[in-house]
Amino acid sequence: IGKATTALKEGNMEQAEKVRIADEEIDQAETDIERLCLRLLLQQQPVARDLRQISAALKMITDMERIGDQASDIAEIIITEDKSEAQDISMKLSEPASKMVRDSVNAYVEKDLDLARKVMENDDVVDELFEEVKTTLINFIAENKGLQGVEAIDLIMVAKYLERIADHATNIAERVEFS
């Protein structure tokens, strides 16, 4: 996520391409982890807490893979668009979404219910921020501030991808209670 948003901020095409390539590695890691979890289920036949942990891990890796997909989608937009001032607007979601991912993973690893709850609370903040960013970008077009329709749509999509990343972080945080 950080590499994708840095690439967007700096207009760094090389960094954006690295993000797209890294998504393939994330996809492979998801497959490998899923295979390990299924092997544990078959060979160990876990019950109770162990079963909940494996189930949570299976769901969590799906969210992590989707976060990688969203970062890759941001990178694809960076590669096709020139850097503009309007990009800063869509980047308002970058830090909150990235922090939510870090915090949700930390909450899962540390079994920190308080941190998980904070992540879940922050989801509403990011949702509101997305609506604000969307409205601002639409106003940029309406006020002829040099933002073309296609670029505005791409930047709204970047903001939406970041909002979806926050949603996936929330899903991970919700699994802390379950596991």
Task: Say what each PLM segment does.
Residues 1-179:
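Cytosolic, long alpha-helical scaffolding segments
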